[in-house]
């Protein structure tokens, strides 16, 4: 049972994408909600996994910001809060 819940949450996490017109805060809330559910059920979710997922799944209007972040910062060292702050500023 637990494994099937984790599998369902993993699929939900992998298919998450920012919706057209969705704000940064709302998208981060959706991603973190799924990630936290996975953690509750025993799945290890490193921050870098979440940061990379968010960078890959933002809407096209953030492409130039994502490129800038990837060039200037090591995504392994970027916290979720730092990423959110960087995106909100833009």
Residue spans for each PLM region:
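Intrinsically disordered, low-complexity linkers and tails enriched in Lys/Ser/Pro/Gly that lie
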Residues: 1-90
């Amino acid at each position: 049972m637990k494994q099937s819940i984790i599998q369902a949450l993993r699929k939900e996490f992998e298919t998450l994408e920012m919706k057209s017109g969705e704000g940064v805060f709302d998208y981060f809330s959706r991603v973190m909600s799924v990630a936290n559910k996975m953690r509750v059920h025993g799945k290890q979710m490193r921050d870098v996994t979440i940061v990379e997922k968010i960078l890959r799944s933002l809407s096209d209007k953030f492409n130039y910001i994502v490129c800038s972040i990837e060039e200037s910062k090591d995504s392994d060292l970027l916290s979720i809060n730092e990423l959110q702050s960087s995106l909100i500023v833009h």
